[in-house]
A protein has these predicted regions:
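N-terminal intrinsically disordered, low-complexity segments enriched in P/E/S/T
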Residues: 2-6, 29-174
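N-terminal secretory signal peptides and thylakoid transit peptides that target proteins
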Residues: 2-21
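Residues within well-ordered alpha-helical secondary structure of globular protein domains
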Residues: 16-22, 68, 94
Length: 174
């Protein structure tokens, strides 16, 4: 004869299934390990790092994220140019970034701080292509964080120009 302590009640079963389901969802969304050279590192407040407390991305990982393209004029080019890459918010989400401030650091150690809200409010792209071609370091590559200046005219000012970062190598999440 079974006693109440021998059988599982419905709530226990549902809680267990929920925990297993959450475990599967978390595993399915885990950030892959880079297989090629690391082109971007996220550090700081991350929920899904792939190397200790950092999230490293190679170019293939960035290519697998949803891609966005836009053409815009910038202070750095004489004509409008086409930028293609994942949205900054997609990159941050892939690493489980949470915080209020981002510090973008370039290969030459130039850095700029921007509110993390910019990633939600504006379609900021971590561009890996310029006019459909990979960017060399001498052409502001391999990654260029750029705002859609022409799509949102309020962005055409020194504050947002200064928040763009070419030769991007690191994003610190604070």
């Amino acid at each position: 004869m079974r006693t109440p302590s021998d059988r599982l009640d419905r709530r226990t079963v549902l809680q267990g299934l929920g925990a297993v389901g959450l475990g599967w969802a978390g595993a399915a969304q885990a950030l892959d390990q880079p297989r090629g050279p690391v082109v971007l590192t996220l550090s700081g407040q991350l929920r899904k790092p792939n190397d200790g407390r950092n999230a490293h991305f190679d170019m293939a990982m960035l290519e697998r994220l949803p891609q966005t393209s836009f053409s815009t004029r910038t202070p750095w080019y004489a004509q409008a140019r086409k930028f293609t890459g994942p949205l900054l918010r997609e990159v941050l989400a892939a690493a489980g970034a949470h915080g209020s401030l981002l510090r973008a650091v370039a290969l030459n150690d130039y850095w700029v701080e921007l509110p993390i809200d910019d990633a939600a409010r504006h379609d900021v792209v971590v561009a890996r292509l310029l006019d459909d071609k990979p960017m060399a370091v001498r052409d502001k590559g391999p990654l260029f964080m750029v705002y859609p200046f022409d799509a949102q005219p309020e962005l055409r000012n020194p504050v947002y120009y200064s928040r763009s970062a070419w030769q991007l190598r690191t994003i610190e999440v604070r």
